[in-house]
A protein has these predicted regions:
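Membrane-interface transmembrane helices that cradle and orient dolichyl/undecaprenyl
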Residues: 89-92, 131-149, 154-157, 175-181
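Hydrophobic, aromatic-rich transmembrane alpha-helices
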Residues: 277-300
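Membrane-interface alpha helices of multi-pass inner-membrane proteins
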Residues: 35-38, 101-103, 146-161, 171-174
């Protein structure tokens, strides 16, 4: 089963390495390169998983530190495509369609471009796809071990990128709903699932430690200087968990913006995003493949 995914991983990594950034970059990628090298706190929402895995990547291996951080993105982009092929094969999809799906995703603009430089997306996608696989396996088998493993990966997914929060919420609540209701054991299993989820989110505690000890690069220190250049930091922004809460919920605004739900605006955003995905991302590659797949399905 794993021969085809291994081949996809090797080919994808070779392709990404052809265009990978050779050294230090700018903007968010430069920030992530520094964090991978020395640790610290990134801009909201903190992205602790990237920082922790990045520290491992920059500790071992050759080449300059900035390149190793770029290599992290390329490696996990290739690993995500390999995992996608393995996942689809396990779901009964043939080898050719599974590889076509990996090709469509792996050559889409955002996925390809973020595989070339230090970014959080490929690592986050890898963990999220693993969480999806294990969640479906847990729902289908009802096994407690798989359910707890899925809960852990769902928590870890949030440490990768908060963009997956809607998926995590739906998957987590579905797992909780499907826990067998067997008296007191039911409550025990629910609490165990919650504990597994919280355990997956423990990388966020690294942000608390890095902030309180002044370890590495700290975006929160920059916020302190920008908001209160001469006056002391107010008590409401001084406690570790208040600062962590701001990182996760503020959308990089101080004071944090309140959340509002406007159905028309949500519909417009969905429409705009769908158009961009169809025009610039998966659409140009996936549409011909979808037509070919539909034709084959009709022919058989």
């Amino acid at each position: 089963m794993w021969l085809l995914p291994a081949a996809v991983f090797g080919l994808a990594l070779a392709g990404y390495l052809r265009g990978i950034a050779p050294g230090l970059l700018w903007g968010d990628s430069a920030e992530m390169q520094i964090l991978a090298a020395i640790g610290g706190v990134a801009h909201p929402t903190g992205y602790p998983l990237f920082t922790l895995v990045g520290r491992l990547f920059t500790t071992f291996g050759g080449g300059e530190l900035a390149f190793r951080a770029n290599l992290l993105s390329a490696t996990f982009a290739a690993a995500t495509l390999a995992l996608l092929v393995a996942f689809l094969r396990r779901r009964g999809v043939g080898g050719v369609p599974a590889c076509a799906a990996a090709l469509a995703w792996g050559t889409s603009f955002t996925f390809w471009s973020t595989a070339q430089r230090a970014e959080v997306y490929s690592l986050a996608a890898f963990v999220a796809l693993g969480a999806l696989w294990l969640t479906l396996a847990a729902l289908e088998s009802g096994e407690r071990a798989r359910r707890l493993g899925a809960g852990f990966l769902l928590g870890l997914t949030l440490a990768g990128h908060m963009a997956f929060a809607p998926f995590v919420a739906v998957a987590g609540l579905t797992l909780a709903w499907r826990v067998p209701r067997r008296g007191a054991a039911w409550l025990g299993d629910e609490f165990a699932l919650l504990a597994a989820f919280l355990l997956g989110g423990t990388p966020f505690l690294y942000l608390v430690w890095a902030d309180t000890t002044g370890h590495g690069l700290s975006y929160l220190k920059l916020v302190d200087l920008a908001q209160w250049p001469v006056s002391p930091v107010p008590a409401s922004f001084r406690t570790p968990f208040a600062r962590l809460a701001w990182l996760i919920t503020s959308r990089n605004e101080y004071p944090a913006m309140s959340f509002h739900f406007y159905p028309r605006l949500v519909a417009k955003n969905i429409s705009d995003t769908s158009f961009l995905l169809a025009l610039f991302e998966i659409g140009p590659v996936a549409f011909p493949l979808a037509v070919w797949g539909a034709w084959r399905r009709r022919a058989t």
